[in-house]
């Protein structure tokens, strides 16, 4: 009696980069980021695929998602109109604190004319001064922040393309080669501590006109395989995003924000 051949599983490539506290690829907390933990839970519950986790830069990850021959997913994507042309997105998975402006306190006087309370008028700051802003190439900082950056001349932006882009931008800032860095405070806080710096030397400013929270999605290649994967991922996220992910993210926040975040996270997905 002939035995039917075992059908090979499709290979799903998960694209990750070092993005603490979402994904942590090195050091004592390796694999303990909020999205690291989510990804492990998704993989465990998606046995229909062979899963590979691949480290890429943000720019390279976007290239791979655009390749119609590639079956790839990224668990840390923000929705943008441009990406929606070639990525099939999951429902929102995790609400995260929005990005903002990171400066060393010695540079604070330069910002004074552009502050409204703690919030910075980023567009006016970059238009009216000679200061350059460090950003990660290919990263979306939310549709609202992207809309501020898009019309600015390239001369005011210092783009970093490497694997450890934010860490390298902070190092440039510490050495005085760059005064402004765009980043997420939980990520920046983690990296400053990893570099042996003091948080007391830094100030974080939310950006005027930007919502307090933004939402990460899983995004897969917009192909039949990618769309099928997202259908399954959406089913799994319904419970994960309510019951599991908020606490995994909150542990990386400043202590005084943790309770407030967990309370607000209960309402993130009403109607979503």
Describe the function of each predicted region.
Residues 16-20, 95-100, 196-234, 259-263:
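Periplasmic-binding protein-like
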Residues 50, 120-147, 234-272:
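Ligand-binding clefts/hinges and TM-proximal coupling segments of bilobed small-molecule sensing domains
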Residues 10-25, 32, 116-143:
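Short loop->beta-strand "edge-of-pocket" segments that line small-molecule binding or catalytic clefts
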Residues 54-127, 206-210:
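Acidic, polar ligand-binding/catalytic clefts
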Residues 39-47, 124-163, 192-199, 251:
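Ligand-binding cleft/hinge of the Venus flytrap
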Residues 44-45, 54, 59-72, 151, ...:
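Short helices/loops that flank or line small-molecule/ion binding pockets
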Residues 8-86:
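Extracytoplasmic small-molecule ligand-binding "clamshell" domains
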Residues 36-46, 105-119, 127-128, 132, ...:
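Extended ligand-binding regions for polar small-molecule ligands
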């Amino acid at each position: 009696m002939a035995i039917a051949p075992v059908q090979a599983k499709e290979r799903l490539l998960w694209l990750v980069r070092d993005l603490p506290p979402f994904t942590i690829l090195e050091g004592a907390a390796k694999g303990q980021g909020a999205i690291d933990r989510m990804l492990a839970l998704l993989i465990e519950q998606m046995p229909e695929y062979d899963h590979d986790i691949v480290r890429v830069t943000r720019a390279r990850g976007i290239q791979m998602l655009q390749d119609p021959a590639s079956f790839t997913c990224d668990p840390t994507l923000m929705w943008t109109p441009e990406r929606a042309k070639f990525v099939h997105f999951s429902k929102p998975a995790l609400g995260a604190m929005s990005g903002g402006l990171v400066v060393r306190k010695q540079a604070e006087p330069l910002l004074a004319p552009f502050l409204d309370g703690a919030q910075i008028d980023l567009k006016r700051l970059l238009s009216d001064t000679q200061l350059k802003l460090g950003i990660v190439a290919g990263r979306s900082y939310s549709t609202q922040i992207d809309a501020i950056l898009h019309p600015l001349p390239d001369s005011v932006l210092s783009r970093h393309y490497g694997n450890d882009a934010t860490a390298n931008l902070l190092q440039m800032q510490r050495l005085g080669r760059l005064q402004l860095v765009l980043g997420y405070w939980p990520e920046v806080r983690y990296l400053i501590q990893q570099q042996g710096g003091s948080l007391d030397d830094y100030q974080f400013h939310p950006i005027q006109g930007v919502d307090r929270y933004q939402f990460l999605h899983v995004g897969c290649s917009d192909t039949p395989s990618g769309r099928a994967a997202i259908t399954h991922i959406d089913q799994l996220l319904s419970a994960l995003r309510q019951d599991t992910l908020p606490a995994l993210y909150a542990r990386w926040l400043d202590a005084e924000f943790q309770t407030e975040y967990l309370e607000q996270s209960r309402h993130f997905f009403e109607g979503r």
